[in-house]
């Protein structure tokens, strides 16, 4: 009888040590896998940040806005007869956004008779949705006055449209302000209903927390880590099952030891 008691006691200690070793193994593997997964996620986030910075780098070749100045000078040529011929360049500068200044210098030519001829270059500036300043020499006053009148009209229309947009935004934002306290008042009566049933709120929180784990596992699967796809959930389930089995075995062994010690 003493031999049976000693064997049962030895068996009890063997079960206890075996269970402790198994739990330590599974806990260590679970911690290591979680640590590796966190490192991989941090590396993936760093890679995405570097890619976004590289994509947002500005190109030196393309300029969206700025100022451009073009100077065009006329060329003169003289012949043996004393006649001079002048060639005048034409400037056609287009800018997407910004300010443009084009200065054209007039050319003079003299003949043997003492007569001077001056020629002025022509500028054809076509800015698109920009403010253009072209101080070219005044050829005719009517064209310049018409041009400034057109620009003033367009500026007036732009200011009127901006004022209308501001008025529309103010009218749209006005009635929205009093709606917020109504929603707050509507949400306040629902609070005491959840206080009455504590279990309902607990179940609701568990339901909300459950899909987050599934989303993490799905992200890992989509990233291409097939080895660790769903590793966290499987380890949790395995560790919980093994812990429950170990506790059951320990309880059985303890009852056996006590029964042998008391009744025998």
From Swiss-Prot:
Pro-piece positions: 239-264
Compositionally biased tracts (Basic and acidic residues): 154-166, 217-226
Biased amino acid composition, Polar residues: 82-101
GO cellular component terms, semicolon-separated: plasma membrane; side of membrane
InterPro entries the UniProt entry points to: MSA2 (IPR001136)
Signal peptide start-end: 1-20
Biological process, per Gene Ontology: cell adhesion
Sequence repeats: 60-91, 92-123
Main location: membrane
Pfam families the record matches: MSA_2
Function: May play a role in the merozoite attachment to the erythrocyte.
Domain writeup: The N-terminal region appears to be involved in lipid binding.
Protein name (Swiss-Prot/TrEMBL): Merozoite surface protein 2
Gene assigned in the entry: MSP2
